[in-house]
From Swiss-Prot:
Name of the featured protein: Olfactomedin-like protein 2A
Domain of life: Eukaryota
InterPro entries found in the cross-reference section: Olfac-like_dom, Olfactomedin-like_domain
PTM characteristics: May be cleaved at Lys-295 after secretion.
Quaternary structure and partners: Homodimer. Binds to heparin and chondroitin sulfate E.
Biased composition, class Low complexity, residue ranges: 209-219, 352-377
Disulfide pairings: 395-582
Basic and acidic residues composition bias: residue spans: 224-234, 243-254, 340-349
């Protein structure tokens, strides 16, 4: 059967030979040499490959044909690879592996079948083309891509139809909510109208009963004033005389004027101002306990008060101070002083015979010894009330204990920082989520923070790194990522206000907390201002050359001064977190264990250090931020995605 099948083979090739015979082709065409290519494949993420081919020369082919071959007459294909993850391979087509045999094959074809030379040439051409282009593999890839595109198209159609249904349901639900809201708005409008009508009726009744009330109030006040005068005649006779010469009928006159104004306003149907009654009550309840007359002029007192009010740049002097004692003003009939009373009314404490020393921010300086005066706040302060003298007295004490933390919210990632501006009068909260980024999120207050309702988002021009940022006096202070630069970003005008370089800081990618890419540069704010804490080289100890440096910064230009810079004995890799209170640096020994200690303290006032060994609880065992807020006297902490505060106790 095999012998019978052999004869038809030349007949099958004859038509192809006849078709190719119409084109003249030379046997030594250069097309064959063009197809001799080396193919290289590489696999791996880090790979560099190189193929080196050494073919036989024409002289070597002639020597091999004549039987005079040498040792160096051979061809090779070498593969050279480099890289940690690399696999290389080099291959070559048959025409390139043995050029001598290729020439012998061509000569045999010329001698035995000249008509098949053209066919062999075309076969070699097609073989080289298929080998170099790898058309079958390309076809397989194209088919696979086409099938993936079809699958993707079907899934997109299904998802779009499903999302369209969700959007339609949402629009329908929002329309229903809008109708309910409109109904509630109409009800609220009716309630407001009813309340306005009732308020107008009550106002008219009060206006009708007003003429009898001031007479009684004036009489009782006159009796109280007369009784107070009778008690003080023996002690302050001369003062009473000088004070009586000035006259006291103004408060009743003002009361009558207010009653007449009340009648006019009630006739018009308007509402009373909410501040009118409290001022009148304050005047009626005043009790004169005694007077002291000084020769200092009114202008000198006013100038001294203004000068002392403007002294100091610390945030503590912007807070309303505590008020101890109760007294009346020096000139109750002064109209200018009545106008200035809601802002800051001067009170003199004369309960005892001698002047009493009261912590205050405003003192009256005259030629004779004067009692200390203080400002009366018009509304209850939101935070602790500390004056400049009280601040210095409180900072003389040291930290006695740290209470267990109070959790306020769980927000964001495991690492982050949250803070308040201690120099601000509002309760805005600022959050940096994670230890690397360029966004600062602002919340109006703690309730909005718990609800996730942010009020502002700041996109910074340069990325921050770490969790040691602070917000102070309306600016965000942070360390620029992967540099030794510190930046002050103005939050109100949204631009970089200052830029400085810490030349002696030791900056590396690894940190004492072993957070990837975290920064060792830590900002802090205490009662005295802005500070920066960073590691530097210690020339005194070669075994442990890196120590923690504490320096007070100028908030304006971020400058560092030698007289306000201290090198501590705290080593860089020996603590977890640190914070600054009243000019004393405290360091917690661990951050990833629940039971920790405040193991180190450095006092900048004396230049000495100590080991207080105070218990400190890392409740969630991953504390990435601890910062002191001098306005609230608490520590703000970020522990494994939980926002906490610690209450501090001091030894005064």
């Amino acid at each position: 059967m095999a012998a019978a099948a052999l004869p038809p083979r030349p007949l099958l090739l004859l038509p192809l030979v006849l078709l190719l015979s119409g084109r003249p082709t030379r046997a030594d065409s250069k097309v064959f040499g063009d197809l001799d290519q080396v193919r290289m494949t590489s696999e791996g993420s880090d790979c560099r490959c190189k193929c080196i081919m050494r073919p036989l020369s024409k002289d070597a082919c002639s020597r091999v044909r004549s039987g005079r071959a040498r040792v160096e007459d051979f061809y090779t294909v070498e593969t050279v690879s480099s890289g940690t993850d690399c696999r290389c391979s080099c291959t070559a087509p048959p025409s390139s592996l043995n050029p001598c045999e290729n020439e012998w094959k061509m000569e045999k074809l010329k001698k035995q079948a000249p008509e098949l030379l053209k066919l062999q040439s075309m076969v070699d051409l097609l073989e080289g083309t298929l080998y170099s282009m790898d058309l079958m593999k390309v076809h397989a890839y194209v088919h696979k891509v086409a099938s993936q595109m079809n699958t993707l198209e079907e899934s997109i159609k299904a998802n779009l139809s499903r999302e369209n249904e969700v959007v339609k349901d949402s629009v329908r639900h929002l329309s229903e909510q809008l109708r309910h809201y409109e109904n509630h708005s109409a009800i609220m409008l009716g309630i407001k109208k009813e309340l306005s009508r009732l308020g107008l009726q009550l106002l008219q009744k009060d206006a009708a009963a007003a003429p009898a009330t001031p007479a009684t109030g004036t009489g009782s006040k006159a009796q109280d004033t007369a009784r107070g005068k009778g008690k003080d005649i023996s002690k302050y006779g001369s003062v009473q005389k000088s004070f009586a010469d000035r006259g006291l009928p103004k408060p009743p006159k003002e009361k009558l004027l207010q009653v007449e104004k009340l009648r006019k306003e009630s006739g018009k149907g308007s509402f009373l101002q909410p501040t009118a009654k409290p001022r009148a009550l304050a005047q009626q309840q005043a009790v004169i306990r005694g007077f002291t007359y000084y020769k200092a002029g009114k202008q000198e007192v006013t100038e001294a008060v203004a000068d002392n009010t403007l002294q100091g740049t610390s945030w503590l002097e912007q807070l309303p101070p505590k008020v101890e004692g109760r007294s009346n003003s020096a000139e109750p009939n002064s109209a200018e002083q009545d106008e200035a009373e809601p802002r800051s009314s001067e009170r003199v404490d004369l309960a005892s015979g001698t002047p009493t020393s009261i912590p205050a921010t405003t003192t009256t300086a005259t030629t004779t010894p004067t009692p200390t005066t203080s400002l009366l706040p018009t509304e209850p302060p939101s935070g602790p009330e500390v004056s400049s003298q009280g601040r210095e007295a409180s900072c003389e004490g040291t930290l006695r204990a740290v209470d267990p933390p109070v959790r306020h919210h769980s927000y964001g990632r495991h690492e982050g920082a949250w803070m308040k501006d201690p120099a601000a009068r509002d309760d805005r909260i600022y959050v940096t989520n994670y230890y690397y980024g360029n966004s600062l999120v602002e919340f109006r207050n703690l309730e909005n923070f718990k609800q996730g309702r942010w009020s502002n988002m700041y996109k910074l021009p340069y990325n921050w790194i770490g969790t040691g940022h602070v917000v102070y006096q309306g600016a965000f202070y942070y360390n620029r990522a992967f540099t030794k630069n510190i930046i002050k970003y103005d939050l109100r005008q949204r631009f970089v206000a200052s830029w400085a370089l810490l030349p002696d800081v030791v900056y590396e990618d690894t940190t004492p907390w072993k957070w990837r890419g975290h920064s060792d540069i830590d900002f802090a704010v205490d009662e005295s201002g802005l500070w920066v804490i960073y590691p530097a080289v210690d020339d005194r100890d070669e075994a442990q050359p890196e120590v923690i440096v504490l320096s007070r910064l100028d908030p304006g230009d971020l400058s560092v001064h030698r007289e306000t810079t201290w090198k501590t004995r705290l080593r860089r890799n020996s603590y977890g977190n640190c914070f600054l209170v009243c000019g004393i640096l405290y360091a917690v020994d661990t951050y990833n264990q629940q039971e920790g200690q405040v193991a180190y303290a450095f006092d900048t006032h004396t230049g000495t250090d100590a080991r207080p060994q105070l218990p400190f609880l890392n409740e969630h065992a991953y504390t990435t931020q601890i910062d002191y807020n001098p306005k609230e006297r608490v520590l703000y902490a970020w522990d494994n995605g939980h926002q906490l505060t610690y209450t501090l106790h001091f030894v005064v």
